[in-house]
A protein has these predicted regions:
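A contiguous loop/helix-start segment that scaffolds small-molecule binding in enzyme catalytic cores
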Residues: 2-3, 26-28, 34-37, 110-115, ...
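Positively charged N-terminal leader segments that act as targeting/secretion signals
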Residues: 7-20
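Class I SAM-dependent methyltransferase SAM-binding "motif I" and its flanking Rossmann-like core
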Residues: 122-196, 241-242, 391-397
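Short internal beta-strands
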Residues: 60-69, 226-231, 371-375
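Class I S-adenosyl-L-methionine
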Residues: 2, 26-47, 52-149, 154, ...
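Short, conserved loop/helix-junction motifs that constitute active-site signature segments
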Residues: 59, 77-79, 193, 217-224, ...
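Short gly/pro/ser/thr-enriched loop/turn and capping motifs at secondary-structure boundaries
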Residues: 72-73, 91-94, 150-154, 171-174, ...
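Signature of uroporphyrinogen-III synthase
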Residues: 45, 97-101, 235-420
């Protein structure tokens, strides 16, 4: 589709300047479009906790390089033509070593791609985002860091545990229980952590939980201090185990908790008894499969998650164009000749008006036809086009729609039913 400069300015006043600048950058780069890599924090698991900027970038990505995320729904936000590359990392199981991931990002950037590196949590909180940024900087590839909500704060919050509380503490320490396998000596200062005041939060440490708790106690940590482990935090399959620094490892083992999980140590864990809001939601702990098309599943999935459910999107239907396109196109062109237009689904409305506006520019060209809809979802879609529904059945099925039309006391005349 061709747009002149005036049309571009009307659509977006800043777009024309952006395109001019982009063209200039390509010229300065020897005719090759300059790529960019976005190091994007996907948040702790719930896709609703990604930042607005983050979701915007996923929707613009040409290449999506992603880890083993808690929610795969984010991948569906990318354009259909977007290349998706899995480089999943969890504990010692890596689809690609970090050095190869760095090289991949550099290669894609040099190829002029708009790359989104989607990382769980925050890219700069034990996410090795700093190493990837270093590699891009050394290669001269432009990059942008988009912070994410870290599970160090969100995980405890969803378990009813604030990491700070004026009644208990005014500081907290975050550390990792997982270090590089090739390191000759640990750089983790467990003595300093044991002596630190306030809340202590450990990420990626479930395999070493017993060793860490034992070491902390050995360095002076009070064994009776409350502690909690939160697995799959912020999702509908979240599980929380509480105890003390001394008892937590055994309780975690008995409950079968594993990675990914966040461990919290401190008196703030006492607040869970009164502040545990998420695990009390009506659908918490329920796994629900949404079989709608990917384009339509998002709103329903989001509503279910807000009620605490774990949602799996598994489309079993696909909206296809009419098999007889010529016949359908002719019926749309002659829409103004009908007395009634009857719509049986929101998809029917969408397809009808895609074809309609390919021919007509004004909604008034639809003529004086009266409008019937099968249900409130279809009615809502028609309202988006400025059309009011005059007939809607009490039962939102095809039989109910036919009966409603029959019950209309005026002569129906010719009916166009948009089912395809």
């Amino acid at each position: 589709m061709f747009f002149d400069n005036l049309a571009i300015n009307e659509m977006n006043p800043g777009m024309a300047g952006f395109l001019v600048a982009k063209k200039r950058m390509v010229e300065l780069n020897g005719g090759m479009q300059q790529g960019i890599v976005y190091l994007l924090g996907a948040g702790p698991g719930d896709p609703g906790l990604i930042t607005v900027r983050g979701r915007e970038l996923v929707g613009m990505a040409e290449v999506l390089v992603y880890d083993a995320l808690s929610s795969a729904e984010m991948l569906n936000w990318a354009p259909a033509a977007c290349e998706r590359i899995f480089v999943g990392k969890r504990a010692s199981r890596h689809a690609l070593p970090q050095e190869e991931i760095n090289a991949l990002l550099v290669r894609l950037g040099r190829a002029g791609k708009k790359v989104v590196r989607l990382k769980g949590g925050d890219p700069y909180v034990f996410g090795r985002g700093g190493e990837e940024a270093d590699a891009l900087h050394e290669a001269g590839i432009p990059f942008e860091v988009v912070p994410g909500v870290t599970s160090a704060i969100a995980g405890p919050a969803y378990a009813g545990i604030p990491v700070t509380h004026r009644g208990y503490c005014t500081q907290f320490t975050v550390f990792t229980g997982h270090e590089g396998e090739n390191k000759k000596a640990s750089s983790l200062d467990l003595r300093g952590i044991a002596e630190a005041q306030g809340t202590k939060v450990m990420l990626m440490g479930m395999r070493k939980l017993a060793d860490v708790c034992e070491a902390l106690i050995g360095y002076g940590q009070e064994p009776s201090v409350p502690a909690a482990a939160v697995q799959w935090a912020t999702t509908g399959i979240q599980r929380t185990v509480t105890g003390t620094v001394k008892t937590l490892p055994a309780r975690v083992q008995k409950a079968g908790l594993g990675a990914p999980a966040v461990v919290v140590i401190g008196d703030v864990v006492k607040e869970r008894e009164s502040l545990n809001w998420f695990e009390k939601l009506p659908l918490f702990g329920k796994r629900i499969v949404v079989t709608r098309t990917r384009a339509q599943a998002g709103e329903l999935s989001a509503r279910l998650r807000r009620l605490g459910a774990e949602v799996l999107e598994m489309p079993v239907i696909r909206i296809a164009p009419p098999s007889n396109r010529r016949e359908f196109a002719e019926s749309v062109v002659h829409a103004h000749t009908y007395d009634w237009l009857v719509f049986s689904s929101p998809n029917g409305v969408e397809r009808f008006f895609q074809a309609f506006f390919a021919v007509y520019r004004d909604i008034r060209s639809i003529g004086g036809a009266r409008i019937a809809a099968i249900g409130p979802g279809t009615e809502a879609k028609l309202r988006e086009y400025g059309l009011a529904v005059e007939v809607m059945p009490k039962k939102f099925v095809a039989e109910g729609l036919v009966k409603a039309c029959r019950d209309a006391r005026e002569e129906i005349g010719t009916i166009e039913l948009s089912t395809f």
